[in-house]
Regions:
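Extended, non-catalytic substrate-recognition/exosite surfaces adjacent to catalytic cores, especially
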Residues: 1-180
Length: 180
């Protein structure tokens, strides 16, 4: 017998993933995962790079003033235009981002990047988040655990931040602050 509610568990997983993705997007694009991949290795690198949370690997094949061409795992060439990237923020440090200006400052031929497709198959730049999160939802009447999420993606990090992590000093009073 468990107090876990499967609907709440699914919602908690989705909430952690969307929250981490939104946070990571607000803090800016950090750049390519890998650089200077030789052209004759592109197909092999793409085949050996896992898709993570719908974030597909792609390799920059050409750079122009107004667009870049990327090669996807399926072997197709896609176009990312300057207009597609106009809202992209660039990571500077933990508290600073800068506005994206030129494609040549951000991408080089042979860069391994990530893309994500929306419902209309339009692509945009993505990245695997650099942060993790955890969530525990409890019933306040009897303390039963309703949902438990130990991280962003178990395949990338099997460390369960709910059951294995230690609380930070000073965190004991936060529930009382949030309850008021």
């Amino acid at each position: 017998i468990t107090t876990i509610d499967s609907r709440m568990q699914s919602a908690a997983i989705e909430s952690v993933k969307s929250g981490v993705n939104e946070y990571d997007l607000r803090h800016g694009y950090r750049g390519a995962e890998s650089f200077d991949i030789p052209e004759n290795d592109w197909i092999e690198v793409l085949a050996n790079t896992e898709v993570s949370e719908n974030k597909e690997p792609a390799i920059v094949t050409d750079i122009f003033e107004d667009r870049i061409l990327i090669l996807t795992e399926s072997g197709s060439t896609e176009i990312l235009s300057l207009n597609d990237l106009k809202n992209l923020k660039i990571y500077v440090d933990a508290s600073t981002t800068t506005k994206f200006t030129e494609l040549t400052n951000l991408f080089d031929r042979g860069d391994l990047i990530r893309i994500v497709r929306d419902d209309t198959n339009k692509i945009s730049i993505a990245q695997i988040p650099n942060i993790q999160a955890a969530l525990i939802a409890m019933n306040p009447q009897h303390g039963g655990i309703k949902a438990l999420v130990g991280g962003y993606n178990f395949k990338e990090s099997s460390f369960n931040r709910v059951t294995q992590a230690s609380r930070q000093p000073g965190s004991n009073f936060k529930p009382f602050i949030y309850a008021t």
